[in-house]
Regions:
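Short, small-residue-biased leader/transition segments that mark boundaries at the very start
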Residues: 1-8
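Cytoplasmic membrane-interface "Motif A"-like loop-to-helix N-cap segments
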Residues: 32-49
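A membrane-interface helix-boundary motif in multi-pass transporters
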Residues: 41-44, 121-141
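Multi-pass alpha-helical transporter architecture, strongest
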Residues: 56, 60-62, 137-161
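Hydrophobic core of transmembrane alpha-helices in multi-pass small-molecule transporters
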Residues: 66-82
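Intracellular juxtamembrane helix-capping segments at the cytosolic ends
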Residues: 82-95
């Protein structure tokens, strides 16, 4: 039935887009206030956002209900919005203004390449009937990225000159 396909794709798009917008507003506001009290506030805020994507990936992988899928979309959108709102501000804590465009370009390019790789991988998992397990495995990768972020990102200033 075509109407269920349209409704489900529209619902997922709206869910993730709206929740990402909420995440951007929440993440930006929290980060701007937190960094005034703790120089790692932006890093911690980004980590909270990244952390929210972990249960969303697990829900996508193992959830079998409408509520689980919508909940996963909400968590992913809010988490990704919080994380994404803080990428450039965190970059500014480490990279001089002379090199920010280059650094941000490299960061974006890396994200595009990772997205292409993951899309291909998700396609293979889908073909093999293992998409749910694949999403759960992505949660492990995100957890490792979160640990790396928290361990290595130790800014000395809010704005590297």
């Amino acid at each position: 039935d075509w109407s269920s396909d349209v409704c489900s794709s529209d619902l997922s798009t709206i869910t993730i887009a709206l929740s990402s917008f909420i995440g951007v507003i929440l993440g930006g506001t929290l980060s701007d206030k937190w960094v005034q009290k703790n120089i790692r506030g932006r890093v911690y805020t980004g980590a909270i956002g990244l952390g929210l994507t972990i249960p969303s990936l697990l829900l996508l992988g193992f959830g079998h209900s409408f509520v689980a899928v919508v909940g996963a979309g909400l968590l992913f959108g809010i988490g990704y919005g919080i994380f994404d709102a803080n990428n450039m501000p965190i970059l500014c804590q480490f990279v001089s203004s002379k090199y920010r465009a280059t650094a941000y370009g490299i960061m974006n390019m890396t994200g595009v390449f990772a997205g292409a790789f993951i899309t291909d991988l998700l396609g293979k998992w889908t073909d093999g009937g293992n998409l749910g397990l694949g999403f759960a495995m992505l949660a492990i990768i995100v957890f490792i990225a979160l640990a790396v972020q928290l361990y290595f990102l130790r800014p000395k200033t809010d704005n590297m000159e």
